[in-house]
Amino acid sequence: MLQALLDSKDFLALTLAHPEQFDGEFSFNLGDHTQVEVWDTGVIVFEPIQNEGKDIVLSCGVHGNETAPIELCNSLIKQLLQQKIIAKQRTLFLIGNPLAINNGTRIIDENMNRLFSGEHSNPPGLVNPERVRAKKLEAYVDRFYTTVADGRQRIHYDLHTAMRASKHEKFAIYPYRPGRAFSGEQIMFLAASGVDTVLFHHEPTTTFSYFSSERYGADAFTIELGKVYPMGQNDMTRFIATHEMFMRLITAKPLELDAFDADKVNLYQVCRVINKHFDDFEFTFATDVENFRSFPKGFVLAREGGKEIKVEHEFESVVFPNAKVPIGNRTVICLIPAVNADVR
């Protein structure tokens, strides 16, 4: 495996050729500047001999059909392996769900991004590939963050693409973080990366980014980079700014960020999440409605169990509507403009 990676510099290809696991860990050096450690299929660490104090996790492919972030991360990995760029910050790349990537599907059995913070081991337990993999990914993040001294900045960008069109093509979800202000610097980094819209979540979740935020105090985000397309069919010119800013972050080049300015970004507050309680749950709007579509107060968003679910605020925007989820799961996130967010 080591020789195959050294020859091809294509970590994604190696991962997809061995989607369940590698035979064992291996490591090697790039020149006299970087140690590379491969911990498992889809798990590669770049450890600079001299680093600048940030610990960065870039994860992709938690959903197997969300291919643009996978191609973006593989491009960065290849540039690092080719020594076209040199890491100055510790960086962990995670290709989340290789089995689903090979299958060309969002999941194999279950939505992995609902299985973190230990949810993978709650009943029924480790009964499918997503649950097993989520537990392993948690362990790799823990190992990465906790094997160095405290006091370093921890960052985790969990990269996705959405199943539907969006009023805002690229947007990020800022996990719930009670007692901690939101980072204006991080929001402006995202804006410079082409991600000009941020949603502030209002409650704990079992997503990958919430896990890193809550457990390790990381500046963590779920980042949606556009729409789902098959592997190789993404217009990667739409990710030039994202690639550039991630490259600057990893190589410790100046980020040249603007000071936080709420007028330069779109900020939303999650006002509620609507879960499914009955099999007859249905939305009243078209199935192909775009993310961030706004509806006025009193509008009937959905019906289930003989009851209507109406817009409660003057206007509410919807993201990720999906009526076909299992009972108990989220059908949609409702948003209002964020006017008093604690951003510093």
From Swiss-Prot:
Active-site residue list: E224
HAMAP family: Arg_catab_AstE
Pfam family, any one: AstE_AspA_cat
Catalytic activity, as annotated: N-succinyl-L-glutamate + H2O = L-glutamate + succinate
Protein name: Succinylglutamate desuccinylase
Enzyme class, spelled out: hydrolase
Native organism: Shewanella sp. (strain W3-18-1)
Sorted UniProt keywords: Arginine metabolism, Hydrolase, Metal-binding, Zinc
Superkingdom, natural source: Bacteria
